[in-house]
Amino acid sequence: MEKKMFNSLMKIHQKYQDLKQLLETDQILNDQKQYLQIAKEIASITEIIEVFQKFLDDQKVLEDAKTILIQEDDPELIQLAKVEIATMSKNIEEYEKKLLILMLPKDKNDEKDVIVEIRGAAGGDEANIFVGDLFKMYHKWADSQKAKVKVLSSSLALAGGFSQIIFQISGQKIYSKLKFESGVHRVQRVPATETMGRIHTSTATVTVMPKIDEKIEIEINPSDLKIDTYRSSGAGGQSVNTTDSAVRITHIPTGIVVTSQDERSQIGNKEIAMGILKSKIYNLELQKQQQKQSDFRKLAGSGARSEKIRTYNYPQDRLTDHRINFSTSLKPIIQGSLNPIIEALLAQEKTELILQNYANK
């Protein structure tokens, strides 16, 4: 193990011991807020400590076995020492690999819920139908994760699906699993209205944003907002409400426009629209920070129209993620079984982080 990494682990080990002692003091035991904060901090480094302790224990056994090999003349003891050295060396190598991954920098947004926006792009009616298919795919995946889905804003399309839909998924570490979904999703299939059996290509853009909680303050100057109200409408612009309950908010400095019409009241729609706006502004700043960093970790796309990340090929029952050259059967994925591709993307993220760490040394 490199000296720099070993020293870092020793510091974490000492911090763990200090926090454990602090947690048992009367001052902390009588302060529930501080107690929970320290307990959470301990939990965040417990796995690192457990693996590092195994590393230290096996390192000691290895050194003892090497000493026996040098000092002893007994053939039986020497043979046992050789077996011990081989076993401990293998264990230590595995612990080092695991610690390398555990020590990788964490994304501060990984624990957050998400707001997902899907828009029809190229392809007209077929693109809007595809938006509906993607929404169902994410909804089914969320159900499998015991996560909750709430539609925040939607615009129904005449031929089916949505021209746009914005929804929230709440659950355990949802952003960490869906942050790589941003980008252009392309579908290739024969539309139901196609009489000649020709394959059409359509696209939809997906943007995944961390949901901003109350702890994060996003400063928005009221004078930077233009707020319009209008009657909510259904597919094809048909009015479905007799009052101006729908809300459109324009953030003038960034040009971001958000709408909400699914709530019954104007107050409810304004609250939802402001929540979406805050997440969009936060996500915009997040993208700026990522652009300033190195070329690593480009998996989390910006959602730009030019950034094609995935193709859903129905005639060939094939899904391809172009960023990692990953192909698999389309049917399970479109039915919500996203975990194989999520796991492949997470594995690639870890690889890129390790490469980045070495590049920075």
From Swiss-Prot:
A Gene Ontology molecular function term of the record: translation release factor activity, codon specific
InterPro entries membership: PCRF (IPR005139), Pep_chain_release_fac_I (IPR000352), Pep_chain_release_fac_I_sf (IPR045853), Prokaryotic/Mito_RF (IPR050057), RF-1 (IPR004373)
SS bond partners: none
Coiled coil start-end: none
PTM info: Methylated by PrmC. Methylation increases the termination efficiency of RF1.
Pfam families in the cross-refs: PCRF, RF-1
Keywords: Cytoplasm, Methylation, Protein biosynthesis
Keyword Nucleotide-binding: no
One GO cellular component term: cytoplasm
Major place of residence: cytoplasm
Presence of the UniProt keyword Cytoplasm in the record: yes
Residues bearing the modification N5-methylglutamine: Q238
Subcellular location: Cytoplasm
Biological function: Peptide chain release factor 1 directs the termination of translation in response to the peptide chain termination codons UAG and UAA.
Family: Belongs to the prokaryotic/mitochondrial release factor family.
Cited PANTHER family: LD18447P
Name listed for the protein in its UniProt record: Peptide chain release factor 1
